[in-house]
């Protein structure tokens, strides 16, 4: 159980501390490893009031009797020696008791949508119901008496918002080199905060998942606030991408207090500074018979949406046979009809405008938190930006986009139309992530939250040939994203309302298709 020390003290004046630990599970012919966290509640005199070592485990509790358990931490390593201490389970709490629990339904959606949940799916016959909060204690003594007090850091239990910077402290590659990886830092951002019934279930992040990272503690970078523990990796079967799921402390503490109702140690949750966000990026769902796919669109102005042509091309080609819906909320949609006009200004540009019918314009205006975008022409290479779109998966019960932060890696300018002398940006490359389904979403300048571009595609590169391989293998780069600049979008939109349509510069199409048109000139020193 959770260790409570016989000290009478007002817990409100005490402070929580934490340190990551590495946990091994060893049986005949089978090994597993997790990261965990040792939590202590310490008063002003340095006395420990409560202590608990916990992790999020994929090992079914009934199987634990077959394993020997060992724990270590970075301060228990001496020179080349890693000191492992025998430990035993002190409690286990199922993360989900019923299949109607919000957390079960949320994770099960991924299971039914072509995802594996790692490490849970690495154990044969495991189900989501096997996931649990595992408590550990040493066979003799307490872990806090072995770990260097200076190794502990203050922890506040907090919430986060999309785009917040986070750090995962974990112990990956436990069986490879625990000396090197006993307190490993991974830095990235929150892509999505998941809430249901006014409760934060957890967070998604595109930080790279590493083996044995489950149970790692996640903190808001450069703060003492922790938002939860790593539950695992949501990895799509087809290789489209993966995300880490972080279970919130709100859920973890709720389950612990339900198991141990007499405990008086539940900490208060430090709320995030997030505000209600105005939504300008919406999912587009295109369906025909039993096939369905989705993309994203931007609420461009009061009458118009903008997206990529490839997102709605099936609907454009076969409007009678194909349905195209825009999700406004989880339970409100609009369906495009022949009263909505779709215009693709140029075949060379993957850009389409949807002029909404009066009825659909009215539906948009009835939703309080949906508004047209504002845009910004002033952005520089290196500037911080965010991509917002419905990439990798679409869950109509949680109509929330993924948000990823990065920089403008490059932008290139050309005359947009034939005969023009003035140039404007015609392509932006960003390091913020996107995935299948993000197409048609927005690229936003972080400092102003204003639109600077439209997500179009990931870069796809040819991998080096190995040995005698003849097949050409390619790789999609989720952090190399091509976007249509706002200058191009606005100019094309204005051109819709002119009598004489300008002709697009051929080099625009060449640039977007990565067709080279430059001249290589080798400059050498003149002979004397």
Where are these regions (language model features)?
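Catalytic histidine site
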Residues: 1-99, 232, 276-325, 457
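C-terminal cap/linker of serine protease catalytic domains
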Residues: 39, 56-93, 226-286, 361-363, ...
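Generic structural signal for buried aliphatic residues
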Residues: 32, 39, 164-167, 218, ...
């Amino acid at each position: 159980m959770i260790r409570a020390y016989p000290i009478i003290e007002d817990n409100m004046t005490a402070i929580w501390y934490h340190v990551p630990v590495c946990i091994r599970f060893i049986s005949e012919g089978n090994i597993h490893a997790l990261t965990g966290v040792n939590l202590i509640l310490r008063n002003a005199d340095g006395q420990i009031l409560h202590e608990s070592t916990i992790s999020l485990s994929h090992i079914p509790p009934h199987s634990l009797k077959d394993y020997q358990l060992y724990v270590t931490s970075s301060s228990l390593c001496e020179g080349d020696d890693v000191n492992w201490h025998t430990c035993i389970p002190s409690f286990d709490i199922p993360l989900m008791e019923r299949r109607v629990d919000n957390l079960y339904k949320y994770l099960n959606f991924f299971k039914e949508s072509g995802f594996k949940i790692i490490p849970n799916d690495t154990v044969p016959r495991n189900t989501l119901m096997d996931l649990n909060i595992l408590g550990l204690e040493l066979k003799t003594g307490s872990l806090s008496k072995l770990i260097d007090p200076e190794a502990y850091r203050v922890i506040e239990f907090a919430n986060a918002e999309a785009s917040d910077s986070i750090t995962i402290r974990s112990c990956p590659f436990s069986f490879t080199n625990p000396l090197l990886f006993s307190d490993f830092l991974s830095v990235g951002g929150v892509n999505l905060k998941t809430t249901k019934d006014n409760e934060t279930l957890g967070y998604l992040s595109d930080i790279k998942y590493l083996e044995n990272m489950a149970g790692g503690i996640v903190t808001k970078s450069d703060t003492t606030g922790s938002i939860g523990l790593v539950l695992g990796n949501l990895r799509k079967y087809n290789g489209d991408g993966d995300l880490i799921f972080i279970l919130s402390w709100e859920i973890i503490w709720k389950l612990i207090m339900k198991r141990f109702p007499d405990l008086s140690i539940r900490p208060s949750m430090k709320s995030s500074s997030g505000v209600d966000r105005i939504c300008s990026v919406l999912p587009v769902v295109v369906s025909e018979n039993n096939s369905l796919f989705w993309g994203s669109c931007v609420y461009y102005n009061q009458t118009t949406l903008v997206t990529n042509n490839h997102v709605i091309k099936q609907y454009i080609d076969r409007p009678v046979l194909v349905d195209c819906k825009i999700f406004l909320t989880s339970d409100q949609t609009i369906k495009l009809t022949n009263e909505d006009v779709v215009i693709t200004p140029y075949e060379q540009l993957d850009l389409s405008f949807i002029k909404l019918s009066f009825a659909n314009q009215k539906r948009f205006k009835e939703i309080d938190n949906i508004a047209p975008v504002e845009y910004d022409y002033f952005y520089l290479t290196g500037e911080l930006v965010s991509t917002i779109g419905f990439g990798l998966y679409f869950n109509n019960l949680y109509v929330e986009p993924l948000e990823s932060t990065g920089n403008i890696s490059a932008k290139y300018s050309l005359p947009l139309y034939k005969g023009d002398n003035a140039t404007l940006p015609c392509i932006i490359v960003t390091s913020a992530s996107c995935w299948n389904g993000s197409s048609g979403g927005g690229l936003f300048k972080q400092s102003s939250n204003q639109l600077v571009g439209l997500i179009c595609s990931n870069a796809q590169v040819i991998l080096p040939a190995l040995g005698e391989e003849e097949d050409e293998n390619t790789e999609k780069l989720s952090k190399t994203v091509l976007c249509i600049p706002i200058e191009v979008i606005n100019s094309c939109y204005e051109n819709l309302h002119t009598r004489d349509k300008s002709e697009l510069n051929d080099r625009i199409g060449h640039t977007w298709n990565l067709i080279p048109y430059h001249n290589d000139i080798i400059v050498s020193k003149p002979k004397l």
